[in-house]
Amino acid sequence: MSKKSARNIKPGELNLKEKLVHINRTAKVVKGGKRFGFNAIVVVGDKEGHVGYGLGKANEVQDAIAKGVEDGKKNVIKVPIVKGTIPHPIVAKYGSAKVLMKPATPGTGLIAGGAVRAVLEMAGIHDILTKSLGSSNPHNVVKAAIKGLQSISDANDVAERRSKTLQEVYES
């Protein structure tokens, strides 16, 4: 997917839903004891091919979630979905987290765990096989999944890159 088309998405026009992936409590040690803060990873999507993630930090959980949702709306990408799945297998890596995603036949279901499941549900993918390898840190797993979905090229992108028609791409 080209970066140009990702910038054309206007989150205000989409009916975005949010899903909380992870909340982390942090502590800062001060003279009088510990001061707690929170950060939240939130995935937003319309379940029709648009998905984004955001990280919010605040002193209260609800504020952190709200900030995460706002950040997520700024990072929305378009995912090409073909018959409820992805067009081709992908392996994406972010930090030490690695996510493997394979297309599946209709009726297989969403086979994914933890953070990857949230991303794929919000994107609207119904049939897919995934495996999360390496680090299980939700921050990096979400970013690896988004990076993988962003790297998907549909038939139109391939035809454009090869300077061919869509028919020629399918014949080759």
UniProtKB/Swiss-Prot annotation:
GO terms for molecular function: rRNA binding; structural constituent of ribosome. GO terms for cellular component: small ribosomal subunit. It comes from the Bacteria. Keywords: Ribonucleoprotein, Ribosomal protein, RNA-binding, rRNA-binding. One of its GO terms (biological process) is translation. InterPro entries: Ribosomal_Su5_D2-typ_SF, Ribosomal_uS5, Ribosomal_uS5_bac-type, Ribosomal_uS5_C, Ribosomal_uS5_N, Ribosomal_uS5_N_CS, Ribsml_uS5_D2-typ_fold_subgr. Residues 16-79 form the S5 DRBM domain. Belongs to the universal ribosomal protein uS5 family. Part of the 30S ribosomal subunit. Contacts proteins S4 and S8. The N-terminal domain interacts with the head of the 30S subunit; the C-terminal domain interacts with the body and contacts protein S4. The interaction surface between S4 and S5 is involved in control of translational fidelity. With S4 and S12 plays an important role in translational accuracy. This is Small ribosomal subunit protein uS5. It comes from Chlorobaculum parvum (strain DSM 263 / NCIMB 8327).
